[in-house]
Amino acid sequence: MSQPSLYRGDLVSAFPAAVTTAGVGTSYALTSIPGQFTKKVTWSYSFTTAPSAIVINLEASLDGVNFFQYDTYNTPGTIANRSVDVGQNNFVRLNVISLTLGSGAGIGGNIGY
């Protein structure tokens, strides 16, 4: 399965809808820029009601199959806005490892390049 491409200046939703359980978001292919040897992405998550517990990872991959953790966030009640160098990896995604929410709550995530 091919991943959608992420171009310099793009900001995309990491999840197709508000997330209420742990799970992997959409993976995106990072487009290459001539002369660029490392790639920097930004990522964030937001919420309608603050989760009481959360662990969310930014993961990157060379091949789009084998993903590795590059950043993690686990501070409930605050909104994450992070910037991470993912080296020469070609793909990125967000992965919600664990999440505890109140009734009717959900979180969203974004990735920028």
PLM features per residue range, with description:
Residues 39-45, 86-105:
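Noncatalytic modules at the cell exterior or secretory-pathway interfaces
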Residues 13-17, 64-72:
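Surface-exposed loop/edge segments in extracytoplasmic proteins
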Residues 59-61:
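Conserved Ser/Thr-centered positions that define the repeating blades of beta-propeller domains
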Residues 15-36, 49-53, 74-82, 100-104:
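Surface-exposed ligand/attachment interfaces on beta-rich extracellular proteins
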Residues 38, 51, 64-66:
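Short, solvent-exposed loop/turn segments that connect beta-strands within catalytic domains
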